[in-house]
From Swiss-Prot:
Natural source organism: Toxoplasma gondii
Classification via InterPro entries: CDPK_Ser/Thr_kinases, Kinase-like_dom_Apicomplexa, Kinase-like_dom_sf, Prot_kinase_dom, Protein_kinase_ATP_BS, Ser/Thr_kinase_AS
Listed Pfam families: Kinase-like
The gene coding this protein: rop17
Protein name according to UniProt: Serine/threonine-protein kinase ROP17
Phenotypic consequence of gene deletion: Gene knockout results in reduced virulence in mice due to greater immunological control in the host. Significantly reduced virulence in double knockout with ROP18. Modest increase in the loading of host immunity-related GTPases (IRGs) following infection. Reduced migration of Toxoplasma-infected monocytes and macrophages through the collagen matrix. Reduced dissemination of parasites in mice.
Ranges where the Protein kinase domain occurs: 283-579
Length: 608
């Protein structure tokens, strides 16, 4: 029952609402709304919507009349003239004077238009008037509008097609250009990156006030040896002679001139970078120390601290534009010595404790290529080896003994002999063979201690090598036999080969010349023939200066032709007590007998 009652109420409300709407829409002869609706119905297919103008102000507060749209669903909308007191529909009302509800046909805002709308006007005064209805539609204006509209659409389509083609072409060109620019940009960025990383960044890093290119710290040599004060005196004379040579040397060799021109110049500081590690080091060349077949050694130091170093530069003589691999292998051998020692032995520790002169760092001259060809037959490498600086080698020191008094000369030879034997025995304890023992490879420190150097030819004990490599004047009988008989079998390298070379070195230190009548200008075949024909018993010590009898026997043991009976450095330390010499007096040892060393003394020598 309640549902039926609700339905009846809703139905009655709808009927009342529709009746009110019909009253508002009923046209009369004098009704402005009726004429408006009639005109709008005739022009409905071409008419535009009337703008809905609704004021949200309070009607009771308004003084002027305005029009309210009751809907915009179609042109059959109902309109009501509203004033401040009442709202009326379908009645004769007064409208503003001189303001037409309908715009004039044909023109709107200065342009011809077939469809005219309705605009609302407000005036200050109102009065009753009658206006004939005006048609919304004009055929001529409509035809002109249709033609203009079609032409406009055609032009718009043409312009749209042209714009589309232009956009496609521009997009295609832009894609091609962008790809080219990206490729070019990548190459440019790569070049700029290489330039920045390789050249600008090192310069910027060097500009840092805390980075002064300091070289590594060289630890002092550990230990003392008897008679090293006399050796230090000779080292001081060697340093003075080196300074004099640096000041008076006016005619450098061709290789030295090429190094000064293409690699490092003494007139300016040179930046180096360590390999590996990338540590920047600033050094200044001070003078030339010496050179060999593939290297030149220079005295360098840090310009601020003055710490001295020895810099070895590798130079290869190239003949007929042919480049061999020997120099490259030699460079690798120079820095490959550390692989033969346990990892706990660093270069600084080996220098300080073992007294082995190994390169502290592998350097490369900053801003220089890997190598440079100078004067068509010299190849200069930018890779260098940095060593602690010594005063010179033992051959230079032996040449200065003639100008010294007998006591200091004797003490210097005694101390040098003991240190040479100990150094080589210490090296053999690692199971290695030096392969190039000679006076030039024993360096003299300013403290009077000797150091063993040049480890480019080292091998493990009993390791074979063919062809053998040796300094000609220090050739052992095994290598001489291989050279004379032209054997093509690899020769096993043992400690006995080093013992022969040590015997040659000691004989030259004490006697000033080579044994068996070998001369400095002898060829390899001549030396090989002399070594094979000679025997240790034929050694002549008549020209030797105050050599002790024990050292004569020791040199004879080192120069035995048969390797099996040849004396080794470790055996010499155990057999000859004079190697444990303590006093610096030349008269303290003139005995001819040779006393064996006791067990306690041998243990002490091994510890030393």
């Amino acid at each position: 029952m309640e549902l039926v009652l609700c339905f009846v109420i809703i139905t009655i409300s709808g009927v009342i609402r529709e009746s009110s709407a019909l009253l508002l829409r009923s046209p009369t002869s004098n009704d402005v709304f009726g004429e408006l609706v009639a005109s709008a119905e005739r022009a409905q297919p071409l008419a535009t919507r009337l703008t809905k103008r609704i004021s949200r102000l309070n009607f009771n507060d308004r003084e002027d009349d305005f029009w309210e749209d009751h809907g915009d669903a179609s042109w059959n909308n109902s309109y009501t003239l509203v004033n401040g007191r009442t709202t009326l529909g379908s009645e004769n009302r007064r409208r503003p004077a001189s303001h037409s509800l309908i715009e004039r046909p044909y023109y709107r805002d200065g342009r011809l238009s077939p469809v005219l709308g309705v605009q609302e006007r407000r005036g200050r005064s109102v009065h009753s008037y009658h206006e004939e209805p005006v048609s919304f539609f004009d055929q001529r204006a409509f035809d002109e509008y249709t033609f203009r509209r079609r032409s406009q659409l055609h032009r718009q389509r043409a312009r749209a097609g042209l714009r589309s083609r232009i956009k496609q072409n521009v997009r295609r060109l832009w894609t091609s250009a962008r790809g080219a620019v990206r490729g070019w940009g990548r190459r440019v960025r790569r070049k700029i990156g290489d330039l920045f990383v390789g050249h600008l960044m090192p310069q910027l890093r060097r500009l840092r006030f805390w980075d002064q290119g300091l070289p590594p710290v060289v630890p002092p040599l550990i230990g003392n040896e008897p008679g090293q004060a006399s050796v230090a005196l000779v080292a001081e004379r060697m340093e003075a002679r080196l300074r004099e040579k640096t000041l008076t040397e006016k005619n450098p060799t061709e290789a030295q001139q090429a190094v000064g021109t293409y690699l490092i110049n003494s007139a300016e500081n040179t930046w180096f970078i360590s390999i590996p590690g990338g540590r920047y080091i600033l050094l200044k060349k001070r003078g030339f120390l010496g050179g060999g077949g593939f290297g030149l050694v220079y005295h360098v130091e840090h310009p601020t601290t003055g710490q001295p170093f020895a810099l070895k530069i590798f130079v290869q003589r190239v003949m007929n534009n042919e480049v061999g691999d020997k120099i490259s292998d030699l460079i690798e051998d120079e820095f490959g010595v550390m692989k033969y020692f346990p990892p706990e032995w660093t270069p600084a520790r080996m220098y300080s404790e073992l007294r082995f002169m190994v390169p502290l760092l592998k350097l490369r001259v900053l801003g220089k290529p890997e190598f440079q060809d100078a004067r068509n037959h010299l190849r200069i490498f930018s890779v260098c080896a940095l060593f602690p600086k010594a005063q010179g080698d033992l051959e230079e020191a032996a040449a200065l003994l003639a100008d010294m008094d007998r006591t200091n000369a004797y003490n210097m030879r005694m101390s040098s002999t003991i240190q040479m034997v100990k150094l080589l025995a210490r090296f053999h304890a690692f199971g290695l063979v030096h392969g190039d023992v000679k006076l030039q490879n024993f360096l003299v420190d300013k403290s009077g201690l000797l150091l063993l150097s040049d480890f480019t030819q080292i091998l493990r004990t009993n390791e074979r090598r063919y062809p053998p490599v040796v300094t000609v004047l220090y050739m052992s009988p095994e290598i001489a036999t291989c050279l004379i008989t032209r054997l093509r079998n690899a020769i096993p390298y043992t400690a006995e080969i080093d013992s022969w070379m040590l015997g040659i070195s000691l004989y030259r230190l004490w006697c000033g010349d080579f044994p068996f009548g070998i001369t400095l200008d002898a060829t390899a075949l001549q030396v090989a023939g002399i070594v094979i024909r000679s025997s240790a018993s034929s050694l002549d010590f008549a020209s030797c200066h105050d050599i002790p009898e024990q050292f004569r026997e020791m040199i004879v043991g080192f120069l035995r032709k048969t390797p099996g009976v040849r004396l080794s450095p470790q055996q010499a330390l155990e057999q000859f007590s004079l190697l444990n010499w303590k006093g610096p007096s030349p008269a303290s040892d003139t005995a001819s007998e040779s006393e064996p060393v006791s067990t306690e003394e041998a243990a002490l020598l091994q510890k030393e």
